[in-house]
Each structure stands twice: as structure tokens, then as C-alpha cells.
Amino acid sequence: MNNQIWMMTSAFKSLELGKIVEKAKEADVQGLELCVFSNEGSRKDHVATHLDYENFTSDCAKRLLEWFGSEGLRFSVGSYENLIGGNTADRELNQNHLLKLIRIAYLCGGDENDVKVGTFVGYNDELGIQDGGFEKNLYEYRRIFAPIVKYAEDLGVTIIYENCPMEGWRSRTWSFTYNNLPATLAARKLMYALIPSKAHGETYDPSHDVWQHINPSDVVRATDHSRLHRVHVKATRNLRNQSSIYWGAIYPKQYVNEELAQRAGVPVPQHDWDRYPYEAMLPGFGGYDSMDWREFLETLMEIGFDHPFVIENEATNSAHTGNQGATMQGFKTAVWCLAPILWTLKENEGYTFCDNRPKLKISERKDIPVVTMKELLA
């Protein structure tokens, strides 16, 4: 294969970008997915902001491209929020922020430099609880995203959706946990049918399907391969614990009055993300997870996937410890778990990435004004 392996910068919330570049070189990766969340957003978990999105100019783009090119690194940008649901103010802020990231990607060369924009879609629960709520969310998605995708297409930029259901985005008292429209393959195919443009695609994270007892290799085979631009590397270990015995592993653990639960001897969720019996891991770090990574990678080889693998470190025993040493150990282990399948075995060097990538094109694009959803929908 010879795919690039990248790191996602969400694990380094407190570090400046220069320090993260040093970490990337230390881990022997070839690129970074730069998290560029809004500083005004309501989401607080797994967020980071590693570019000045409010003051990003064509000169900033040129300096960033020259810097990363000199370091042998590539990059994309991403922010993962609810763009079709939640309260109106947050929704509008998130939509406008995504438009800022599309502009940044354009200034950095967009598809010419493989600078994609990672995002969620989110979910509108007010529509979702109605009869036909899923289909209503599809049409709300089309209403909001059709002009966004057209804007990206006109600028030569591709938007890519990640498939996390965001099961912890609602209170633990909420009965269902589907909070991000592209969480299933069926939803993604329906989305592309509604907006046929090639200016949007997906980042596939197999860990979310693993805890739903779906084989990610089957999903990859059924995916429109032209839409698959990134793979997030994150692992899941399905747990056989008291929670799975009492609640099963398909439906979310439900919350009831804790005094009643204690009398009945029934476990209830302790926080919003405590809904399913699994543990977040990284491949090869701290034991086995519940996916056959070799089968998964070989399936991607079969379909000719030649895009980056991006390590997203949310592992309980790595980034979630808050220990920078453990965080880097997790990243490095994941790299070397993937390397024997992805990279070439060189004499006396071991498994090595063969860097035959074209150089980053230093963009000479002129600044364009920031646009808003109100302007796109006018």
C-alpha cells in the first residue's frame, strides 16, 4: 500500500502547533488532521483549536504550506459539531464556522493539496422524535448542506463526514443515542443521493461500527469507494460486563431513578457517554481490541484505498489518562501496528514509508471574504 499515517491533533489540546509538529516527527507520521474547533462553541469534549481561523489570510496559508512542506508533513482541517440540530444560536455558529474552514482549505490549495475539511452533520432531535423523523432529518440535511457543498465545490474543496453516532451528545436520561446523521452506511448513501456532488465524502472510523457488532470490512466493501478519503484509526474493545448482561449490547443503557435502580440491583449510566459496554482503545496498545485490523487493512488494499490513515487518540489508557507520555506511546504503538501492512520492508531499516508524494503546492490564491449561511441561503 504505502499509505500515509497521520495524527489527529485533538489529543494535544494544550499544545501549540509547533510543539505538535515536533510530536509528529517523533512519532514518524506523515501528516496532521488539524482540529480547528470554534472557541465559542458549546462542545467541550475532545476539542482543540490549532489554527487562528478568525484571522487566516492567504499569507497565513503560504507560511503554513511552506512550513509543513519543509517538515515533510501534509494536513487537513476539521471541526466536529451539530450543524442541523441543537439550539438555533449554536447551529448557526457551527454552520458559519464550517464555512470558515472551507475558506481556509481553499486558501491552502484545497483538493490540489489534499486539504480536506472534516465535519459531522449532527441530528435534529425535534424532527427525530416525530413520525418519519429520520427522513425529515435527511431533508433538513439537504436544505442546509446543499449550499455548503456547492460553496465547497466551487472552491475546489471536499467536505468529509465522520460516522460517529455521538451517543453521548444527549443527556443520559434521553432514550435514544443517534445524534449524527452519517452514523450508518445507509444514511451516507442516502445523503449522496440527495446531494450528488463529488465535493463531499467521508472519513470512516471502524471503531463505531465495532461496538454495534458490525464488521467494518463489510462496510468498506459496500461503500462508494470514490467517497472514502480518510480512515480514522481508533479501536474498540467490546466489554462483557454487568451492564451488557442487564441491558444487552444493542440498545443503550437507560437511566432511571438511582434509588429504584439500587433496589432492583440494576446498573444505570453514570454519565452521558456511559450508554454502551465498550472501551476506547488504540490498535496494539494495552491488549487486544474487538476488530481484526489485518482483515480491515487488507480489505482497504483490495479496493485500492490510497489515502491517509489518521490516528484519533481517545484511548482510555492513552490520551484519556492526561499523561503526555502515555499519549505519545499510544500514537507510536498505533503507527507500528499499522506499518507492517501499510509500508515497505527495507533492508536494515525495517518498515518504512516511501515518500513519493508530490510536493505541496505553495498557494498563490488571493483572499476571499468570509461568507455566512444567511448569505448562502439568500
Enumerate the predicted regions with their spans:
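Eukaryote-skewed repeat-based solenoidal scaffolds used as protein-protein interaction platforms
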Residues: 138-139, 149, 168, 187-189
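Residue-level recognition of beta-strand->loop/alpha-helix junctions
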Residues: 9-11, 35-36, 79, 163
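Conserved Rossmann-fold SDR core element
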Residues: 158-160, 203
